[in-house]
Amino acid sequence: KDSKPQLLPTSIVNPIQMNLAFVELFAPATAMCKGDFDNLFVPFRCVASDVYNKKQLIMREGDLGDAVRASMSFPVMFKPIEIDSVLTYDGGIYNNFPTDVMREDFHPDIIIGSIVSSNPTKPNEKDIVSQLESMIMQKTDYSLPDSLGILLTFKYNDVNLMDFDRLKELHDIGYNRTISMMDSIKSRIHRRVNADNVRLRRMVFKSNLPELRFKNINIVGANSQQQRSIKKEFHENPDEIFTFEDVKMAYFRLLSDN
């Protein structure tokens, strides 16, 4: 009996539910800003990596969810995504402290930098993540002159890439450390705004986010008969509008059938 070839998974973390969550979280904001990240409530940048051309990609426009997803796709851990025909990975590969991007795009008076990692150390033969970091990650300059801003440095020697269950613990460490330095931060930033006013403007912005509604589905990697069958899971009538809840139900039905 011939044995079937064994295919290795493309990532340790299954991206199926994560990709769907990113649509729910970021698609309304993408529609609201019309793909221009300068038009978000807080103008946004992130960095991804084009490993084929060995360069960073500065994400200023497009699909917000794809940009964030690309910027965190550490090789092997998370499956990369394709943006404009380029396979994109974690931006930290080439620039893990993109203060240069902030200065070039926003010209800030003060940068508050948060350092939660360091340059790769000597790899451990029992730790595949440390081996990957040593092979992939480029050296990063984590310095920030006092004239440009303030550095918050955190030492997380016992934290690994997959420690998602420690989210609250790590959040609290970051929050408490920042609060302890608040006097220093405020001494560098003289402008003050009313917190209630900012909260109100944020509420107005979020209230204008469009509801997720769908009409067309683009399917890749299936023949015409399979495409028709898949589309029927989402809607019987090609002109029918359906909601994100409909998408989730159909999506997981298809996964369970598979």
What residue ranges belong to the model's regions?
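Patatin-like phospholipase
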Residues: 1-258
